[in-house]
Amino acid sequence: MKTLFKTFILLIAFLSFNCSGSDDNSALSDDVITQPILDAKKVEIINYINTFDCSGSCNYIAFGSKPCGGPKEYLLFPSSVNLTQLQQMVTEYNEMDHQYNIQTNAISDCAVELPPNS
């Protein structure tokens, strides 16, 4: 009987601690991401890229999140872009896209998108 009681107490303690923990991504995971929100964020990023002169060399960055993993596409941008700011914007978009995929139980073709050739 004591063993059963101890097991019960341990189970209750485990469930109490397991359910009370906070997720580091809880702010993002609690927000509902919609396609119009993603579209607006993408337009913001494209508009930011287009404010820079593209006469010099270009680079690319992985963009979007496929449900199977990996990027949906690659964005080309001029080397004159503030790379830190662009990376921050794209990382935020990619995280939102990943969350949207989870929320909508999205599926994809799982094809690997290759980066552009130089």
Segments predicted by a language model, with ranges:
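Sec-dependent bacterial lipoprotein signal peptides
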Residues: 1-17
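Alpha-helical propensity feature that highlights long, continuous alpha-helices across diverse contexts
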Residues: 5-8, 21, 88, 95, ...
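Bacterial Sec-dependent N-terminal signal peptides
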Residues: 16-38
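Extracellular secreted precursors and ectodomains with disulfide-bonded cysteine-rich loops/domains
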Residues: 17, 52, 56, 66, ...
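Charged, low-complexity, helix-prone segments enriched in Lys/Glu/Asp/Gln
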Residues: 30-47, 89-103
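Extracytoplasmic/periplasm-facing segments of secreted or lipoprotein envelope proteins
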Residues: 34-68
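Mature extracytoplasmic domains of secretory-pathway proteins
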Residues: 57-98
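Short flanking/linker segments adjacent to small metal-binding domains or redox-active Cys/His motifs
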Residues: 100-118
